[in-house]
Structures are given as C-alpha cells and as structure tokens.
C-alpha cells in the first residue's frame, strides 16, 4: 500500500469511547496514523468507580482500565496526554500541549470528548470542600480532604445515580449524610414511583433524605461549613454536587456539526455526524432508543464503548451499525439494588403507548432454601401487541433479571415469549418460577 493511502485519524478524548474507536481503527488498519488527544492524564478510565474509591473499596490508580503504555506500545496509538484540543477546523485541529500550541491534520475526526458535571449556579460552589465526582483524581481529592479535615457531616446535592452511590460511600463509613433532592423522589427520571419507594425506605435508614428542597447557597469562611436550602440549613464539612452532566459540544459547534434535539451531537447508525468524515461517540453523542426509535441521550459506559467500536469500524471501512440503546442501568444503596431496562410506565405513556403494567413481589430462592431475599419487579407492556416495553427491578439479585429482560427487549419479546423463555432453575439459585417469569404471567398474554 502506497504512502498516500495512509489516513490520519484524530480522536478527541481518551475515555471509553475514544480509546475503543482508536483501538478498532488500529486493529483494522495498523498502518494508519491514529492520534488521540486527552486533556487530562487519564485514559480509558472508569469514572463509575469513583464512589467505591471514596468508600474505600478500591484505590484511584485502579480506575485506569489500561495504562497509557498499553495503547502506545501494544496498539500503536499515538496518545497525547494533558493535550487539550482548543480549535477544530476542516482538516486540522489545534492542540495546547507541553506549554505550547501545535496543529495536526486529519482525514477522519472523532468527537469522543464526553460530558462534564453540571454545576448549579449558586453561591459557594467554589468553596474548598465542594466536589464533583467526575474523574479519578476527584476520588483521591475527596478521600484526602475527608482525612485532613476529619469530615463527619456530608451533604449530597442531587438524587440521581451518582448522588445515591456517593450517599452509600459516605454512609458506609459512618458519616452523617444529608441528601438534598429538588424533585419529589430520587431517580425520578429513571424509575416509576413504586420502585423508588422501596429504595427510599432503605435510604431513609442511613441518610437524612430531603425531598422537594431547593439548594439556595453553600456557606463557609475558609472552607464549606453548611448548605442552605429553601427549607432549612444543614451542617457540612464536605459537599458533593451530583446535579447531572452535560455533553461537551463546544468543539463540535466550531466545526458546524449538527447538534441533536437532546443537546448532544447528532449521529446516524454508523456514528457519523452531519459533517463528512467526522464521527462522534460516547457521552458527547446522541443515539436512538431501540423501542421508540426516538433520539435519546443516554450517557452510560457500555453504550459509549460500543459507539466507539462502531465509529472505529466504519472509519476503517468495515461497515457496522449501532442499533441504539434501551437505557439499561443498575445501581445500589447498601443491600438494595435497583435497575431498569426499556421504558418506565411514565415514559411509555408520554410516548403515547396504551399500556398494561404489573408490579410483583417475589423471593430470589425457594422458601425452603436459605438466603432467599425479597425482590420486586415492574413490567410495562404495549396493550395492543403484548410487546414488552420495559422492566424495573428492585431488591436483591436483580442483575440476572435486568440483563435477561434487556435481551428480551432487544429481541422484541411479547409477554408470551418471556413466559416461555427456558430459564435455569436449581434451589441455590432461583425459585422454580423465576420472578421474571412470574412477572410475564401476571402481565398476561
């Protein structure tokens, strides 16, 4: 192959999506020049692990899935760390690195520059002791701050996944945790009320849960001392802002890339953007929902990795389509696990479906076998076609049920298909009527 055939691929962002894209291009086209520019010193890191480092279950260095050397030496990727892309134009990018600025040419460009924490516009967010949980160094900074200032009182602002995981991280260490949630319940965008009610029951045993309160300001002299809401004030030596994230679309806008209705970069099923030879993947990109076909922005790691893989494949000439997402997600607080896949009842009604639902309580083992725990499942079905639209699970041993339900949704199962799915059974693992099968039966067909 002649020198003129070697393409230059530039990838902005060295997280899950960026490194997946880079690795895929190099595997298919080893002779191509693949450059990744990562603004921090962390590549292929696992931000989802931050709460567990704060809890003391792991260490920050373990949050890097592969060290940079693996990508540079083993995979031949030209990886630039602490390299911030400051300008993007047709055919080149300008990068700030090593104290200077440099331009690099591209034939193909991938935006994989993720999302950033949404910091509320309130007084005191810049005080010492106020943190976001965004990158592995945040975990280290939080641990060090806790030890240095002997933190006992923690306030978490936000009731989403990160808020709940951070609440566990501090409560498990015996800290006094207050959680301030603007909405009427936690995880309200992801789950229906019956499901979050069970989680909240557990939360309230370990956390001062303040629902429907708006944070007005954070106060302190040298460092944070208290959080003031429209309903009261709470002592705090440490505050976590878990108030959501937003896609980093500024660089894409410079190039005139179309921003989708969700506020993230619009992509097609090949992860191509509206600009030729420009792709986007991961938390910066929107995709389609498998059930509704609508545009959605679901910034979660498994999809981000796959989007990167798909972008890399298509750049290297091996056509591959990304089918979209179900928004499958799972988290836990202490021993209560909660997960979902597909649409909630709330979402399905909003989409115009005529739905039937069922909410059941079951056990994870037969009654005669020790170790059985409670599990609750909610199913949402299209009333006309009996097609499964979504499943939510809360309690214990939820993962096999959520993952099985996700596969069912991907395959377009009806309640009857779900009911007749031949699941495994033995007393140490599950009851003879698995909770998921019982749910299908109660949903009727």
Curated annotation (Swiss-Prot):
Q: Is Oxidoreductase one of the keywords?
A: yes
Detail which positions bind FAD.
Answer: 16-17, 38-39, 45-47, 85, 283, 301, 425
The reactions it catalyses are:
NADP(+) + 2 CoA = CoA-disulfide + NADPH + H(+); NAD(+) + 2 CoA = CoA-disulfide + NADH + H(+)
Cite a single GO MF annotation.
protein disulfide isomerase activity
Cofactor list = FAD
Report whether Lipoprotein shows up as a keyword of the record.
no
InterPro entries per the UniProt record, alphabetical: CoA_disulphide_reductase, FAD-bd_OxRdtase, FAD/NAD-bd_sf, FAD/NAD-binding_dom, FAD/NAD-linked_Rdtase_dimer_sf, Pyr_nucl-diS_OxRdtase_dimer
The UniProt entry annotates the active site at 48 (redox-active)
| Top-level taxonomic group | Archaea
Q: Give residues annotated as binding CoA.
A: 27, 44-48, 65-66, 75, 305, 361, 433, 441
Q: Which Pfam families match?
A: Pyr_redox_2, Pyr_redox_dim
- Catalytic temperature dependence: Optimum temperature is 85 degrees Celsius. Thermostable.
Give the cofactor note text: Binds 1 FAD per subunit.
Query: What keywords would UniProt list here?
Result: FAD, Flavoprotein, NAD, NADP, Oxidoreductase, Redox-active center
EC number(s) reported in the record: 1.8.1.-, 1.8.1.14
Q: How does it assemble?
A: Homodimer. Homotetramer.
Domain remark text: When compared to homologous enzymes known to reduce CoA disulfide, this enzyme shows a narrower access channel for CoA substrates, which suggests that this restriction might be responsible for the enzyme's poor activity toward the bulky CoA disulfide substrate. The substrate channel was widened by making four mutations along the channel wall (Y65A, Y66A, P67G, and H367G), leading to a fourfold increase in kcat for the NAD(P)H-dependent reduction of CoA disulfide and enhanced activity toward the substrate at lower temperatures.
The record's similarity note reads: Belongs to the class-III pyridine nucleotide-disulfide oxidoreductase family.
- Functional note: Catalyzes the NAD(P)H-dependent reduction of polysulfide, CoA-polysulfides, and CoA persulfide, as well as the reduction of a range of other small persulfides, including TNB and glutathione persulfides. The likely in vivo substrates are di-, poly-, and persulfide derivatives of coenzyme A, although polysulfide itself is also efficiently reduced. Shows coenzyme A disulfide reductase (CoADR) activity with both NADH and NADPH, with a preference for NADPH. May also play a role in the reduction of elemental sulfur.
According to UniProt, the name of this protein is: NAD(P)H coenzyme A polysulfide/persulfide reductase
Q: Which organism is it from?
A: Pyrococcus horikoshii (strain ATCC 700860 / DSM 12428 / JCM 9974 / NBRC 100139 / OT-3)
């Amino acid at each position: 192959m002649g020198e003129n055939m070697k393409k230059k691929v530039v990838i902005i962002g060295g997280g899950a999506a960026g490194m997946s894209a880079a690795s895929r291009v190099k595997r298919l086209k080893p002779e191509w020049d693949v450059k990744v520019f990562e603004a921090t010193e962390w590549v292929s890191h696992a931000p989802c692990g931050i709460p567990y480092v704060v809890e003391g279950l792991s260490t920050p260095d373990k949050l890097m899935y592969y060290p940079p050397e693996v990508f540079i030496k083993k995979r031949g990727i030209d990886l630039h760390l602490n390299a911030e892309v400051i300008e993007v134009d047709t055919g080149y990018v300008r990068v700030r690195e090593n104290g200077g600025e440099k331009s690099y040419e591209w034939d193909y460009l991938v935006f994989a520059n993720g999302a950033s924490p949404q910091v509320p516009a309130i007084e005191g967010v810049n005080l010492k002791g106020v943190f976001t949980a965004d990158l592995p160094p945040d975990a280290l900074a939080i641990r060090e701050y806790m030890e240095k200032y002997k933190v006992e009182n923690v306030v978490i602002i936000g009731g989403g996944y990160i808020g709940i995981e951070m609440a566990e991280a501090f409560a498990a260490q015996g800290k006094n945790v207050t959680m301030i949630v603007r909405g009427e319940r936690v995880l309200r965008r992801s789950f229906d009320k019956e499901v979050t009610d069970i989680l909240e029951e557990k939360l309230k045993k370990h956390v001062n849960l303040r629902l429907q309160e708006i944070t007005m300001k954070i106060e302190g002299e040298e460092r944070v001392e208290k959080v003031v809401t429209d309903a009261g004030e709470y002592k705090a030596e440490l505050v976590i802002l878990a108030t959501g994230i937003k896609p980093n679309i500024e660089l894409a806008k410079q190039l005139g890339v179309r921003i989708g209705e969700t506020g993230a970069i619009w992509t097609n099923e090949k992860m191509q953007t509206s600009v030729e030879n420009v792709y986007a993947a991961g938390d910066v990109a929107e995709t389609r929902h498998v059930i509704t076909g609508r545009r959605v922005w679901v910034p979660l790691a498994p999809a981000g990795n796959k989007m990167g893989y798909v972008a890399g494949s298509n750049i290297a000439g091996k056509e591959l389509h990304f089918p979209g997402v179900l928004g499958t997600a799972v988290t836990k607080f202490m021993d209560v696990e909660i997960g979902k896949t597909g649409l909630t009842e709330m979402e399905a009604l909003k989409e115009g479906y005529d739905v039937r639902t069922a909410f059941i309580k079951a056990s994870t083992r037969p009654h005669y076998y020790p170790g059985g725990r409670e599990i609750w499942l909610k199913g949402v079905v299209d009333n006309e076609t009996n097609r499964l639209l979504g499943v939510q699970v809360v309690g214990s041993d939820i993962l096999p049920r959520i993952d099985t339900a996700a596969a069912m949704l991907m395959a377009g199962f009806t309640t009857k298909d779900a009911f007749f799915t031949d699941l495994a059974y033995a007393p140490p693992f599950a009851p003879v009527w698995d909770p998921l099968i019982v749910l299908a039966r109660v949903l009727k067909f």
